[in-house]
Regions:
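PLP-dependent amino-acid enzyme catalytic core
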Residues: 1-287
């Protein structure tokens, strides 16, 4: 992030017609298509006659970087009848604490969980939400400065209240995630990954009577086959591809062709860069 924001590096790369970008949810190009999920889900509920046009629907979203759920906020601002957006966290529950108290504290114990895409302590897209709620570049800049210097910041009570009008929250432990994977498969025949299981568990606690709740499934279970196998009570293989095959055999579900094909692909990128060298490596690129 420091390299992205370094104007000197940007200027030097611009001389070579190079511009740095990121493929994660910091990139607006990642957020825009995610907005479509919410409209598509609402349309499916209408088609199935589960709701009438105009009925509000809640969404529970597993998230660490606050990108996918922010897309839901944009869908709401665009006019989709969204009730609450429930932020589902794993044991790295910094967002749950913030949405409950208004204080964001990144200086805390970090947990490596079975839902690694949510193992985040500094949630990048929350900055965007804070801008929309406060309407103040200066105030948000102050929050980010405090976060960088002290590891925390606190929003005003009225800001927290405004956020809580749209957002709910909850978190799941590792044991609860494993239990949810097993329960959903045994009770519903639905095979979910670890991240989706986080949201299922939180959704069950946060669902309001009479309001439909949509859980956003954010990954294939075959992307995390060892964790899913263990949750279902099977011995996990150390090799992900063997675990993928074992999961297919145990559940009679088929892995996505794109994932299964990776075993036969040639590895194209193997460079591991020390964080201290990122700027130098970026400047070494040629157009």
């Amino acid at each position: 992030k420091k390299v992205f924001g370094d104007k000197d590096i940007a200027a030097k790369l611009a001389e070579r017609n190079i511009r740095l970008s990121s493929a994660n949810s910091i990139n607006w190009g990642r957020l825009v298509p995610q907005i479509v999920y919410y409209f598509a889900a609402y349309a499916q509920l209408l088609k199935a006659e589960k709701i009438a046009f105009g009925d509000k629907v809640d969404f529970c979203v597993p998230t660490g970087n606050f990108g996918d759920i922010l897309a839901g906020y944009y869908a709401k601002r665009m006019g989709l009848p969204v009730g609450r957006l429930v932020c589902a966290s794993n044991e790295n529950n910094v967002l749950t604490d913030f949405l409950t108290t208004g204080t964001y504290t990144a200086k805390r114990e970090f947990f490596k969980t079975t839902s690694p895409s949510m193992d985040i302590l500094v949630s990048s897209n929350l900055e965007r939400l804070l801008y929309h709620v406060t309407g103040s570049d200066a105030e948000v800049a102050g929050f980010m400065k405090s976060l960088a210097e002290t590891g925390s910041y606190t929003v005003r009570p009225e800001t927290l209240a405004a956020i809580q009008e749209s957002f709910g929250c909850g978190w799941s432990s590792e044991a609860e995630v494993a239990g949810e994977i097993k329960a959903r498969y045994e009770q519903d025949g639905y095979l979910c990954d670890t991240h989706t299981a986080v949201a299922f568990h939180v959704a069950a606690r946060e669902k309001q009577a009479g309001v439909p709740m949509v859980v956003l499934s954010t990954a294939s279970p075959f992307k995390f086959p060892r964790s899913v196998l263990e949750a279902l009570g099977h011995t996990a293989h150390e090799n992900d591809f063997e675990a993928m095959q074992a999961l297919e055999a145990a559940t009679h579900h088929t892995a996505p062709a794109s994932l299964a094909a990776l075993r036969r692909k040639t590895e194209r990128f193997d460079m591991v860069i020390d964080p201290a060298r990122i700027a130098d490596v970026a400047l070494s690129y040629q157009s």
